[in-house]
Amino acid sequence: MIITVTCNPSFDKTLEVPGFAPGRTLKARTLHRQPAGKGVNVSRCIAALGGRSVATGFLGQGEIPIYTSSFDQLQAVVDFVPVAGDTRQNVTIRDPERNAETHLREEGFSVAPADVAALERKLSELAAPGDVVIFSGSLPPGMQPADLARLVRLCAGAGCSVAVDSSGPALAEAVQPGVWLAKPNRDELEELVSRAVQSDDDVRRAAAELRETVEILLVTLGDDGAICFANDRAWKAAVKVDVVRNSVGTGDAFLAGFIVAHLEGQPPETCLRRAVACGAAATQELWAGQIDPAIVEKLLARVTLAEF
C-alpha cells in the first residue's frame, strides 16, 4: 500500500486576471478550485497511473466531506486527522496577456500537540511492513520539524519504505537513517549540505554525503530534468516539452511516477525515466495533480537517460 501524508493541505484556486498588477481593482474569473496539497497531488497522480493509495495528514474538520467526495472516483482513500480551523487556500493568478503566473500561499490552520499525537496514532494504525509512506510538503503552524522526524522514524520502524519531499528545517530533520528516498531540488540540496551546489561535481559530492543516510536520492533540476543516485550508481534523465501549461505540482507527479514504477519492480533508472515523463506530463495539464497516462507514454519515448 502507498500512504501519502500531507500535514499542510490546501484548496488550490486558480483565477484568470488579464493585465494583473498590484495596487489596482481588477476583475477575476475563477477557473478552477480543488482540494490539494503535495501529498494529495501525489495520491491523485498515483490514481491516474492505476495505483492505489491512502491519503492522510491533517485537515480542517469542515473540509473532510469535500476532500472525501473529490476522491470518490479515484483509487484512493481519504483518512485525515480533523483539526480545528480552516484548511488554507493557495491562489494562482494567471495573466493571459503576459503569460505569467502569481502564486499566493495562505498560512492555514495551526495544530496542537494533541493533533500531532493523533496523527502518530493514525500512522501506527495504517503503516505496515512493505508499505511506502510519502511525507510531502510543508508543516503547519504548531508542528515542529522534530515532530515530522518522529513520524518518519515511526513508519521506518514499522518496516515501511519512507520517502520525504519537503524543504527547510523539516527536510533536514526528516532525512535521517532509515529513510528510503529523499527528493530535494538543487536549492534544497544546498540547504541539506550547508554549501553551494553548482557544478555536476558539487552535486555528486553532496549526494555522496546524503547517500550515507538515504537509500535513493532524487535531485530535481526543473527544465534540466533530474538525477537519481541509487545502488552506488547515478543517472540523469530529461525531456523537453514545447509548451508549459501549468507549473504547479510537477514534482508531485514526478514522485508519483517513480513510486509506482518502483512498486512494479522496475530498476531505479527505469523509475527515473517514468518519473521525468510524469513530471513533464503534468505541465501539459491545467491543474495540479493531474496527468494523462497516454501523454506520459508519449513523453517516455522522448526521455533521454545517461549515466551521471
Predicted regions and their residues:
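Hydrophobic anchor at the start of a short beta-strand
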Residues: 2, 52-54, 78, 162, ...
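Conserved phosphate-binding/catalytic region of the ribokinase-like
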Residues: 172, 200-308
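Conserved phosphate/ATP/ADP-binding segment of small-molecule kinases
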Residues: 145-234
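Positively charged, low-complexity intrinsically disordered leader regions
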Residues: 1-24
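Short beta-strands and strand-loop turn motifs
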Residues: 103-105, 130-138, 165, 183-188
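Conserved phosphate-binding/catalytic loop of the ribokinase/pfkB sugar-kinase fold
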Residues: 92-129
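Short beta-strand scaffold segments in enzyme catalytic cores
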Residues: 44, 91-93, 225-229
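Substrate-binding N-lobe of the ribokinase-like
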Residues: 27-87, 299-302
